[in-house]
Amino acid sequence: MDIPGAQESAANSSNSSLGATLSTSQTERNKSGHITAHRQSFAEDQRRPPPSPRSHRHPSLTQQAVQELMNHPPINRHANPQYAGRNWQEIAVGELAVADDVKWTDLDESVQDATLTLLKNHPTNAVLVRETPTSKRAISTFDYSDLNAYLLVVVGLAKPEEEQIELYDHIAKSAQAQTPVALREIQPILKKSELVALPAEATLDAAVEAFGSGIHRLLITNSAGEVIGILSQLRLLEFFWKEAVNFPVIDRLYGSVLRDLQIGSTQIIAVNADGPLADALLLMHNEGLTSVAVVDQGLNVLGNISTADLRLLTSTNNLPLLKRSCMHFISVILNERGVEHGRDSFPVFYVNPYSTLAHTVAKLVATRSHRMWVVETASPSPSAPATPLLQPVQLGVTAATAPPPTSVTGVGSSSSPGPQPTVLVSSQTPSAPQSPLPGQSFPSVPSASLPGAHVSGRLSGVVSLTDVLNLFAKSSGLRPSDPSEQRARRRRSSSASVRPSLDAGRGSVDFRR
């Protein structure tokens, strides 16, 4: 997901350090005990939700024109002399490496300083971590998922194992005292996956196999083992989008529709629009996700929350957002994009089963997202919010179910009907904060308060960068490993230090993308 600008405002407000920002909740925990169970009505609490930028901005294109553009995205039909006539599997990964993408921090730098570097490094959404300031060898990374893990510890949502209680208390107390916390100190709570590196002379077939297996980024190294670039799933997909005319095996896939290709998953985790933002952050951490769909009680997709949106929570003034609803946070995101950066907030985080692969890839590249939500025809939403769902909801019972495919042309596909869509909606109850966050209890914004809230449709699936690159790999005769192994590994390392994941409320199918 694209991070607007270089976040100068966050850098300039260094007097409100991340440690000081997050420590406020620890002080309030000692004063307040538990969050009050009494909840005021929507009418009392949300008379004035943040205005949408649409209310005072006139987009340069009409909504219909934007939709038409997304339905028929332009593709570069002119062969690039650099790649014309070449087999993409023989292109060196070093040709795609960009030296400016490599930003460093070291283990002895504070989380606050590392966060400021991360906010400025929007191309890769990651900062490389090294042992010393002069080293060129990475030993880890620091990204928004790591920032999320740190935030959850400091605000009191984390439940450590017995042997880590002392460490968690130390981190929280240091933040409360506004004492810088070094990256070295928080490494045990991050439980990072092993870094994967490729020499610059390695070819793209190795990168596509790795990405199609669920690896999110690769380090590009020179002959001395020093990092000279970072290749991400998104960067590689962007390359295939722009240069597809040079590679017929890839280019011919773009005209196929998702339903025929049978890529993606029909089992999805989502969050309720009326649930607190803290629940969404906890869910993403527990499940090893970088983004999650926000749905109403009719399972209509209302928006998308990403770990990259944590950039909006790094100042003291914004910390109370953790207790406000996911819908309210979406309105904040829209305002930040539309007002501060002049971007039209037209929602583009979804596709439908009859969208072409070209349409889907165009949206992934344009929004810099890790996944697109697959939706069916929009359905009415109940006027009064019901109790958030805890168990899997079979869309065949409570919502429209997509018709089974009758003809399949995709790689690894079959003529048998696919599994019925299942959406697991996070509950507010089990993941409520153990300690109160600053200020009073903040309510949710009614889902109907945002213009265009129901234009997407009912959630029925998800297509990720991994899915698309896995398709490219198999179409080219490569044999990527099962992506579910990587996803399960990320989730196990994440959920071990916070709270139980949603395994008890779903089947055995792994669907983290």
Curated annotation (Swiss-Prot):
Residues 424-447 have a biased composition (Polar residues). PROSITE patterns: CBS. GO terms for molecular function: protein serine/threonine phosphatase inhibitor activity. One of its GO terms (biological process) is cellular response to glucose starvation. Residues 1-62, 400-449, 474-513 are annotated as: Disordered. Its main location: cytoplasm. Signal peptide: none annotated. Keywords: CBS domain, Cytoplasm, Nucleus, Repeat. One of its GO terms (cellular component) is cytoplasm. SMART domains: CBS (SM00116). Residues 190-249, 264-321 form the CBS domain. Residues 9-25, 400-423 have a biased composition (Low complexity). Pfam families: CBS. The keyword Metal-binding does not apply. It is found in: Cytoplasm; Nucleus. Involved in DNA replication and cell separation. Belongs to the SDS23 family. This is Protein SDS23. It comes from Podospora anserina (Pleurage anserina). The gene is SDS23.
